[in-house]
Design a protein with these regions (language model features):
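N-terminal beta1-alpha1-beta2 submodule of the flavodoxin-like/Rossmannoid cofactor-binding fold
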Residues: 24-106, 113-115, 179-186
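Binuclear metal-dependent phosphoesterase catalytic core
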Residues: 436, 444-488
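N-terminal active-site segment of His-dependent metallophosphoesterases
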Residues: 193-266
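C-terminal outer-membrane/trafficking sorting elements
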Residues: 21, 739, 845-889
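His/acidic metal-ligating clusters that form di-metal
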Residues: 233, 238, 243-253, 285, ...
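Extended active-site neighborhood of metal-dependent phosphoesterases/phosphodiesterases
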Residues: 266, 270-373, 445-448, 453, ...
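Acidic/histidine-rich helix-loop elements
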Residues: 66-82, 206-238, 301-311, 324-331, ...
Length: 889
């Protein structure tokens, strides 16, 4: 067989082809020392690419032996006759459809200042097919420059569009390849830059280190049998999530709200940290908080070895903080003593407070005081504050503690009120393994607070959150993504009503084609003595990625000449056109029993496991509960999917549960029956704070939240302010805004306003030392054309004749300040002639004395009450002095 034909036989399956999406970038690489392979493997996690590896036809050749004697010989042969195919060493067959691609990345090592010989063979054979393609170069070498490699590529791809920015990674730089690749990909426009206005929020990945499963056996299967979590897929799901973050989401910050590991095993934590290091290498920051499964004694923290288990070493608080120093517990963070609660500013202007709710779901009063202190300090600096905590902040439906005793943080009302009063508007939580957002308020219902509970990465539906922030962090847009569909293996179920077989499909295009046309009902037929067959709804599409081979019992295959699907219950040998689709994982022995019409449907691994686990959990409560367990489990699945009221099955499921609770009164009592009704209604109508004046429905999957600007008024109840945003003061209770519409020699006349244009200086009046939230608006602003206040968005040097709002000896007014002093950011000042301080006059009514300086420096000798009675020692109040009304505060 000719070399050219061999080059067209073997394909490496391209992800885009399997999924029915045309890929845009092909990476062709050759690696001898594994350096280029390492680089390309990392590249594939940062950019969606299809990869083909170039391999010598003869295995085991040592090109480096005897000072690269063989490698030099091959290069010399090419140099001698570069246009002769016989000059190039043979390589294993490679197939690639170049018409699919706009961009081709050639990744190769350098041999003696030239391109490695096997890569030259590949380009010699395929260079013409790369005409008009964008050609990118990645070269690895010890020290030599790469110009010779580039020259070889340009010779072998004469009509390629070579890109000027080549990436040269020296052998010594391979450990830094992730960072170098990211920089190169961003600079060349192949991927988007890391977005510091975006966060990704994960929770409860429960990663189990591969080494904990020494060997499969009853110890492992017994543990799994009661799980609703996909612990057996935890590594796969976490790995895929890390790739999605690096390649697709590219946020500036990742938050993980606890239960990082299966049960606190140090080896599992080490696995998690290694993956987080991948994010850090390309500039993505991560902050974590521990959950109840992450440290301390846990009987499930074991190695599984056949029928036995051995205890694994678990993390302590100190060990956890040390190991996660780069992820919340190191430089740049403040910790509350030796606890695992901390505060940091991962992105300028955004402070994150990680609250450790312990293994029992409690937050101490001392910790709460510390959190308030840090939140207050951050707000005083004009920064936005969010928090994360493992245990949910509030109940998300009535009776939630019937599912998990620690479903809500202990003393939750106090925690809720404290955080809300401290100006924390959003808390990201986990623990309950469902993605549900609940809203509540502080004690007097003047401040909103949201509990954004994110589901477990290994529990259906395997959710994560994507959070996009406005540039000033005043707007937060939350969306919800799911990882299971792409990360978990594809399974299908074949049943005739009495016999069931579950197959796990491989990743070939033919298997994907079958999966995409399900569900379907077909007649099963006997064929030969070892197989059952059926004809799919439409022809299965397949490509060169299909797998031929022997088919042992339990194999699912496509017989392409006839287009039928084959289920083997006896061994079969390899046959031309017989392509393997997958293998039975359950019920292989029932294939031979299938008869009549069969239904072939998709199996949702995560959903099925959750449904089964919850059903068993409820049934275990007793006979009466077992009767409603299937429906109750369905209700919980609907809840896990979020936005329950949009689910077509929710109303029917609720009606069934309410009826069942009513009929079950005789067995469980009226109180318990009502509790079940409330739980079902709250859950399936998506109502948090059910049955109270706080009851509300909040979108669980897509939500925009305002993070208002905050200002603390001075002790006298006045402050100046200036914002980048248009503000609607009418939305804020208890505070009034004013602009200055006239300045005289003795007074500053104020005019009340409601909607202020952006970058407008103004005065706020309210309760002294109180915090107020200020909200953005798109509404029409008031006319402030006559405003004489100058706002500052950044710290500004005071010009000549500057006056600032202040209180001296109990008198509030505008006092002169020295030129050159710094006016803080987001404040306002006046400029006026003279050096006399000015009083405040609101709507023509003087609220301070006419001559502030005179009052401060020497109190007038005579004061009279408004009724004309002379007052020898005036206290706070309104008086007449020198024929003018004055106010003493």
């Amino acid at each position: 067989m000719s070399k050219t034909r061999r080059l067209l036989l073997l394909a490496i399956l391209l992800i885009g082809v399997c999924c029915g999406v045309s890929a845009k970038t092909l990476v062709a690489y050759y690696s001898f020392t594994n350096n280029v392979r390492t680089i390309v493997n990392e590249l594939a996690t940062q950019k969606e690419v299809d990869v083909v590896e170039i391999q010598p036809a003869e295995e085991g050749l040592d090109y480096a032996a005897n000072n690269y004697a063989l490698g030099t010989q091959l290069l010399n042969a090419i140099k001698t006759a570069p246009n002769d195919a016989a000059s190039y060493p043979e390589i294993k067959p490679v197939s690639a459809d170049f018409t699919q691609y706009d961009d081709i990345i050639v990744a190769t090592p350098l041999w003696w200042s030239q391109m490695a010989a096997p890569m030259q063979t590949f380009l010699f054979n395929n260079g013409a097919a790369m005409e008009g393609k964008n050609i990118w170069m990645i070269v690895s070498s010890a020290n030599s420059g790469i110009s010779g490699v580039v020259a070889d590529a340009e010779r072998l791809i004469p009509n390629g569009v070579f890109q000027s920015n080549k990436l040269w990674i020296k052998s010594s730089q391979v450990p830094q390849a992730a960072s170098m690749l990211n920089t190169w990909l961003v600079e060349t426009g192949q991927v988007s830059a890391i977005n510091n206005q975006k966060m990704v929020v994960l929770s409860d990945p429960h990663v189990m280190a591969p080494g904990l499963l020494v060997s499969e056996g009853t110890a492992w299967t017994t543990y799994l049998s009661g799980q609703r979590k996909l612990v057996d897929y935890s590594q796969r799901l976490f790995d895929d999530m890390i790739v999605r973050i690096k390649r697709d989401l590219r946020p500036g910050l990742v938050l993980i709200s606890g239960d990082l590991t299966k049960d606190g095993e140090q080896v599992s934590h080490e696995y998690v940290i290694n993956k987080l290091d991948e994010l850090r290498a390309i500039g993505i920051k991560t902050l974590v908080i521990p959950g109840n499964h992450d440290r301390g004694s846990n009987s499930d923290a074991v190695y599984y070895d056949g029928e036995s288990t051995t205890a694994a070493t678990v993390a302590t608080n100190g060990w956890f903080a040390t190991q996660y120093a780069n992820y919340g517990y190191g430089v740049g963070s403040e910790r509350e003593g030796t606890t695992l609660t901390y505060a940091c500013e991962p992105i300028t202007g955004l402070v994150v407070i990680g609250i450790d709710s312990g293994t029992d779901g409690n937050v101490s009063e001392t910790t709460l005081d510390w959190v308030v202190e840090k939140a207050t300090a951050a707000r005083a600096s004009g920064k936005k504050v969010i928090a994360m905590m493992h245990h949910p902040l509030m109940p998300h439906f009535a009776g939630v503690d019937n599912f998990v005793s620690t479903a809500v943080v202990g003393n939750y009302e106090t925690v809720r009120n404290t955080l809300a009063d401290a100006g924390i508007r959003v808390v990201f939580t986990g623990h309950f393994h469902t993605s549900d957002i609940a809203k509540d308020w502080n004690a007097d219902m003047t401040r909103e607070i949201y509990d954004v509970n994110t589901g477990s990465l290994i529990s259906y539906p395997c959710d994560y959150r994507e959070v996009t922030m406005s540039a000033d962090f005043t707007d937060m847009a939350i969306t919800t993504g799911r990882i299971a569909d792409e990360a978990l293996p594809k399974r299908i179920k074949v049943t005739d009503g009495n016999h069931n077989v579950t197959f796990e499909l491989n990743e070939t295009s033919a298997a994907q084609s079958l999966y995409n046309m399900l569900p379907t009902t077909k007649e099963v037929q006997n064929y030969s003595t070892n197989e059952k067959i059926f004809y799919p709804e439409t022809a299965i599409s397949y490509s060169s990625d299909c797998i031929e081979g022997a088919c042992p019992a339990g194999t699912l295959a496509l017989f392409s000449p006839w287009g039928n699907v084959v289920m083997y219950y006896g061994d079969a040998s390899q046959y031309p056109g017989l392509y393997i689709l997958g293998n039975a994982v359950e019920g292989a022995g029932q294939i031979s029993e299938l008869t009549g019409n069969i239904t072939v449907s998709k199996v949702e691994i995560a959903k099925e496991r959750l449904n089964t686990a919850v059903k068993n959990q409820i049934a275990a409560k007793g006979t009466a509960y077992s009767l409603i367990a299937p429906t109750a489990a369905q209700a919980f699945v609907i809840h896990a999917e979020g936005n329950e009221t949009e689910n077509a099955s929710a109303a029917t499921t609720l009606s069934t549960l309410v009826s069942a609770a009513e009929m079950g009164k005789a067995f469980i009592g009226e109180a318990k029956a009502q509790e079940l009704k409330d739980m079902a209604s709250s859950m399936l109508e998506d109502k948090s704070q059910y049955g109270t004046d706080r009851e509300n429905v909040t979108n669980d999957l897509t939500l925009s939240i305002e993070l208002p600007e905050a200002i603390k008024l001075a002790a006298d109840g006045y402050s100046t302010y200036c914002s980048e945003n248009r503000l609607d003061i009418s939305r804020t209770t208890g505070v009034t805004a004013y602009i200055v519409n006239n300045v005289t020699e003795t007074t500053v006349e104020l005019q009340e306003v409601s909607v202020l244009p952006a970058e407008t200086g103004f005065i706020l009046k309210g309760t002294g030392n109180a915090w107020y939230d200020l909200y953005k608006t798109e509404g029409v602003a008031d006319d402030v054309s006559g405003n004489q206040l100058h706002g500052t968005l950044t710290a500004t040097l005071a010009p000549l004749n500057t006056f600032a709002l202040s209180t001296k000896k109990g008198v509030t007014g505008f006092y002169p300040v020295n030129a050159g002093l710094m006016i803080p950011a987001h404040k306002a000042y006046l400029t006026a002639t003279g050096s006399m301080a000015r009083s405040l006059s609101i709507d023509g009514e003087v609220t301070g004395i006419l001559n502030v300086d005179s009052y401060v420096n020497a109190i007038p000798a005579e004061f009279y009450s408004i009724h004309g009675v002379k007052v020898a020692r005036p206290t706070k109040g309104i008086y007449i002095s020198n024929g003018k009304k004055v106010v003493i505060k």
